[in-house]
């Protein structure tokens, strides 16, 4: 029992670690930013729900189109999309990656808009959970679940972090065995990841929802609601100092949260940076010492190079703090997340029947587990790159090689249409390691002493004997 408990605890810790790391990567996925978007939640019989959002993610229009069987209103759908892109000055289109996603993407890509409109596939896992949630009902009391789901897809494209915090992380589908692990420990770990991601990126206090604000360090759910209520009543915050007027925003809370709240366009440019208000006087002193204004210090790298870091080190301000401040002054308020890139699947692949062994195709990493990575290559079933196939070198942790939403090139090694399984490899040609189906160990391990296969096996205890019986059952 002790051994079983120890094994379960270790397995739980590993599963929680995998889920937490995947969630962190998903939350920090590349945002499109403030752009007007058209989002499509694809479907066949029930049609594709279509919404237009403004640059802040507000719903401005919704309708449905029926380009696929049984209605097959392809040309009418093309005309509707083209008209809406022109009417609402749409800059990008997001297509959900669920049922009929590829066909809908093909439809959108066939349209000549007469201008550049970037098209993205958006992971819609959990969108249906959001659309039926209390949060969604509160945001869109007069819309049905299909409209809410399409809005969620569009907002995920604009800013994945702001939208995904509204969904229970367990519904996003990026873990392994998450329903079998200790749920209290899992929730605690995931909450820490969300809070860490939100604080890492920072939050625009004038546009953030209360669901996002409550993950900022020091801000409770009640205070988040008070911030939104104050903003609604008094208009946008003009400075970080104004936050002190919000009910329940005490000095200690302000000290905890101020550095993570951004105010774009504030009179003091530091209000849109990660520099904490208690360090403003230090930055102002730096500017004065090089005979420059705060704005000049931010704009001109040559002025920042003149700063003698050691001069500002005190008991409470270390060298690392000074370096962090100077780094932030290079690009105040910069988003630390990577820039979004447009991606296309192989146009010749529409279903698993089109996938052939030996094909090299582009794909997107959709899930990472301890045993490998799942990759979407544009068919309904994701393919698996086993951990042994991720690299020509030995890999102990798949996260060392791939990240969620990463664009990768994969080669098909196995296709089982009946069981809907696709085996993939990311190994490059010329590697010394074995490919799927070949024998032998990895070269890195060849220097280990050879096993003596003539040696008599050690006697089994009762537990080992049962374990061996189980293994035989699964292998037979």
Tell what function each PLM region has.
Residues 1-36, 55, 78-83:
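Extended, highly charged clamp/arch subdomains and adjacent linkers
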Residues 3, 91-100, 120:
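Short glycine-rich phosphate-binding loop at a beta-alpha junction
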Residues 31-59, 250:
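Gly/Thr-rich phosphate-binding beta-strand-loop-beta motif of the actin/hexokinase/Hsp70
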Residues 37-39, 49, 105-107, 239-242, ...:
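Short beta-alpha junctions and helix-cap segments that line functional grooves
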Residues 57-90, 94:
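Nucleic-acid-processing active sites and adjacent nucleic-acid-binding tracks
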Residues 61-74, 144-145, 387-398:
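Flexible beta-alpha connector loops of hexameric P-loop NTPases
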Residues 129, 138-236, 251, 255-282, ...:
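Long, highly charged, low-complexity intrinsically disordered interaction regions
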Residues 261-476:
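Single-stranded RNA-binding regions, centering on S1/OB-family and related RNA-binding modules
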């Amino acid at each position: 029992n002790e051994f079983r408990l120890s094994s379960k605890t270790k397995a739980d810790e590993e599963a929680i670690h995998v889920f937490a790391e995947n969630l962190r990567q998903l939350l920090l996925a590349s945002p499109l930013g403030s752009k007007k978007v058209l989002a499509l939640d694809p479907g066949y019989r029930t049609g594709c729900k279509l919404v237009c959002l403004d640059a802040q993610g507000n719903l401005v229009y919704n309708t449905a189109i029926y380009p696929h069987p049984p209605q097959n209103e392809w040309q009418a759908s093309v005309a509707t999309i083209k008209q809406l892109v022109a009417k609402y000055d749409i800059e990008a289109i997001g297509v959900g990656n669920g049922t009929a996603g590829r066909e809908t993407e093909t439809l959108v890509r066939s349209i000549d808009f007469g201008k550049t409109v970037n098209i993205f596939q958006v992971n819609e896992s959990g969108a249906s959970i959001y659309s039926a949630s209390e949060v969604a009902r509160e945001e869109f009391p007069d819309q049905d679940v299909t409209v809410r789901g399409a809005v969620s897809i569009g907002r995920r494209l604009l800013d994945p972090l702001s939208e995904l915090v509204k969904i229970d992380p367990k519904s996003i589908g990026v873990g392994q065995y998450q329903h079998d692990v200790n749920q209290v420990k899992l929730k605690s770990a995931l909450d820490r990841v969300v809070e860490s991601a939100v604080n890492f990126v920072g939050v625009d206090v004038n546009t953030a929802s209360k669901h996002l604000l409550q993950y900022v360090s020091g801000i409770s759910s009640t205070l988040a609601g008070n911030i939104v209520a104050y903003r609604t009543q008094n208009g946008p915050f003009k400075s970080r100092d104004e936050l002190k007027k919000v009910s329940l925003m005490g000095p200690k809370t302000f000290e905890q949260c101020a550095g993570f709240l951004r105010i774009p366009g504030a009179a003091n440019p530091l209000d849109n940076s990660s520099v904490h208000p208690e360090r403003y006087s230090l930055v102002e002193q730096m500017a004065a010492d090089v005979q420059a204004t705060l704005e000049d210090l931010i704009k001109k790298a040559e002025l920042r190079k003149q700063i003698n870091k050691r001069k500002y080190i005190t008991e409470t301000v270390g060298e690392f703090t000074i370096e962090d401040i100077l780094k932030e002054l290079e690009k105040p308020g910069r988003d630390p997340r990577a820039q979004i890139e447009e991606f296309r699947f192989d146009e010749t692949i529409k279903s698993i029947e089109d996938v052939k062994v030996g094909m090299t195709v582009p794909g997107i990493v959709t899930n990472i587990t301890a045993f490998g990575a799942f990759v979407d290559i544009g068919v309904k079933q994701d393919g698996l790159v086993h951990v042994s196939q991720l690299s020509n070198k030995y890999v102990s942790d798949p996260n060392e090689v791939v990240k969620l939403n990463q664009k990768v090139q994969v080669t098909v090694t196995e296709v089982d249409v009946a069981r809907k399984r696709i085996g993939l490899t990311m190994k490059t040609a010329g590697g010394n390691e074995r490919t799927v189906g070949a024998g032998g160990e990895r070269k890195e391990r060849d220097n280990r002493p050879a096993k003596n296969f003539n040696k008599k096996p050690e006697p089994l205890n009762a537990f080992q004997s049962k374990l061996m019986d189980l293994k035989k059952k699964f292998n037979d």
